[in-house]
Amino acid sequence: MAALGNVLILAREELIAALLGLMVELRGLQPMFLKREESVTEALTRLAFDAVVIDCDHPDCTGDLLDTIRSAGAVPILFSPSRMQAEVREVAVRHGIRSFTLPTDPDTFGRMLEA
């Protein structure tokens, strides 16, 4: 399996975003974050992303956004630092996407990023 390249991280908390960014780097990938005052849609047109890791409680996390991410050619990956794994998985299955919960280990996270 080939690894993904640029990974956009959309987390509600900066500390969580930084942690995920480090885990992305450990896989040899490039973590990316929204610029100040930038919308997710603007970021998706600014750069090509192979994956978007998005907190299921992020204010922009909607079915429409997940469709937009796919339309941009990226793989949406849903996560949560606070919800139960079954709860997040249920939403992910409904949208046909990957998911994980925190805490997670680098290998499990890395498998989410494999194409």
Where are these regions (language model features)?
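Output/docking surface of receiver
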Residues: 77-115
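Phosphate-coordination loops involved in phosphoryl transfer and adenosine-cofactor binding
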Residues: 3-6
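Short, structured coil segments at secondary-structure junctions
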Residues: 27, 72-73, 93-96
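Conserved phosphotransfer microenvironments
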Residues: 17, 50-72, 81-88
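Acidic, metal-coordinating helix/loop segments flanking the phosphotransfer/catalytic sites
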Residues: 35-51, 58-59
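Alpha-helical interaction/dimerization surfaces of two-component signaling modules
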Residues: 22-24, 43, 91
